Each structure stands twice: as C-alpha cells, then as structure tokens.
Amino acid sequence: MNPVRKKRLFIVLAILAGVGIAVALALSALQQNINLFYTPSQIAAGEAPEGTRIRAGGLVEEGSVKRTNDSLSVAFRVTDGAQAITITYQGILPDLFREGQGIVALGRVNADGVLVADEVLAKHDENYMPPEVTQALEKSGMMKHYEGGKQEYAK
C-alpha cells in the first residue's frame, strides 16, 4: 500500500471513529433525558421501570393528601379511575394542587411501587390537562370527552 492510500485510510478511519463516538454520546444524553409517561394502572401493574425517572399523572384522590407537621413531606394518591398509586414528594406543592385536580409527577418508582417525585406539576387552568392524563382518564371512563367549556369528571 502506497503512502497516499495509507494516509487516506487513516483519515477515513479517524472520521468514522469520531462520528461513532459523537453518536454514542448523543444517544447516551438522550436516554438520560427521556421521561416516559405511565398511568397509575401501568405503574400498579409493574410496567414502569424501577429506579428510572418517569412521568406519571392522573387525578389526586379525595382525602388522600397527607402532610407532615414538621417538614415539607407530603404523600398523596393519584388515580386514573382503574388503579391508584401513592406519590411522595419533599417540597412545596404548586398553588394549583388540590384534591380532585389533574397532576403530573416526575420521579422514580421505588421497590414498594411508590413514586418518589422530585417535581409535581398541576394543570395551569381549568380547561387544560396534559394529553397523556386526558387519554388515560377517558380510557378509564373517569372523564367525559372534552367538547369545549369545562371538562367533566365522572364521580
């Protein structure tokens, strides 16, 4: 092999190695930032991966919010109409958080099936609900199809 071909082969291999490393780094970064959405039914059935950051949403069950007196710890149950899961959170809840309200929590499921949230989001006005939560509630029959005006929740 003459020196020109050797040099060209070395350059092509170096470029391929660089592109391979860049793709591997990009995929690694994307995998760490993907937060898949799971319904309470899926989490209760064990479909959510333990220890991986996920999003879960539904309606906060009436009478399920338990606060501690000496810290910012709060535990509550979220339902999609079929199943309910417990979510624990350490921090100040959003102003719009209340029982019967749609929420999305970001966190990790522990070995007990409890979602340990590091972020809780409440819907920001009376007409908005995250699409995933809306679909899960419609599927379970807890929410009638939205046709303008106020959303109605089945009791």
UniProtKB/Swiss-Prot annotation:
Q: What is its main location?
A: membrane
Residue ranges, Periplasmic side: 30-155
User: Entry's Pfam families?
Assistant: CcmE (PF03100)
> Where located?
Cell inner membrane
**Cellular component terms per the entry's GO annotation:** plasma membrane
Any single GO BP term: cytochrome complex assembly
Q: What Gene Ontology terms describe what this protein does at the molecular function level?
A: heme binding; metal ion binding
* Transmembrane segment boundaries: 9-29
Binding residues for heme: H124, Y128
Q: How does it sit in the membrane?
A: Single-pass type II membrane protein
| Tree of life domain | Bacteria
For this UniProt record, the keywords arranged alphabetically read as follows: Cell inner membrane, Cell membrane, Cytochrome c-type biogenesis, Heme, Iron, Membrane, Metal-binding, Signal-anchor, Transmembrane, Transmembrane helix
Those parts of the protein on the Cytoplasmic side are: 1-8
Q: Which InterPro entries match?
A: CcmE, CcmE-like_sf, NA-bd_OB-fold
Please give the SUPFAM superfamilies that the UniProt record associates with this protein.
Heme chaperone CcmE
The record's PANTHER family line, in alphabetical order, gives: CYTOCHROME C-TYPE BIOGENESIS PROTEIN CCME HOMOLOG, MITOCHONDRIAL
What is the role of this chain? Heme chaperone required for the biogenesis of c-type cytochromes. Transiently binds heme delivered by CcmC and transfers the heme to apo-cytochromes in a process facilitated by CcmF and CcmH.
* Family in the record: Belongs to the CcmE/CycJ family.
State the protein's name. Cytochrome c-type biogenesis protein CcmE
Source lineage: Bacteria, Pseudomonadati, Pseudomonadota, Gammaproteobacteria, Pseudomonadales
